[in-house]
Amino acid sequence: MALRKVIVEGDPLLNERSREIKEITDRIRILAEDMWDTMYEANGVGLAAPQVGVLRRLVVIDVTEPPDEDGDEPEEDAEPIPEPEIIKYVLVNPEIIGISEETVKTKEGCLSVPGYVGIVERPERVRVRATDLDGNSFVIEGEGILAKALLHEIDHLNGVLYTDIAESIEEIKDPGEQPES
């Protein structure tokens, strides 16, 4: 498909609430494909439609653990390396339906806030109801990186950046230091 430009903090679109998707059309499917391409090109784990300038309630998330590639050849009698669990979602009209009382503080970054990270306190676990691109409703129960990504991307749909809720924000000195999200 196509790469889309990721808009950055300061663009007023990022502070607006996104509109519900009433019908899943080919345009919405193309937008989702473009969002995957854009997110992967930027090494992100999630992307919300407002980040590419579209005020619709659409999110893509991929928190699949990359395979451990240390470059060593496996020994002949070694156990086979298990395939990573694929944790990848397209969420149409996602809605938070439950959060844990327990919270966790972690570093977050954002493709729309390049060069910075912040400490954000979020619920440790979350339940989200959404629809897929075929119109099927489903519920995700996420914790850890998945919970953080779900909450972060749904914030985008509501016009909230992590910088709006971060306890502290710092500039990244080393570009390899960018955390997931």
Question: How would you describe each model-predicted region?
Answer:
Residues 1-151, 156-181:
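Active-site rim/adjacent substrate-binding subdomains
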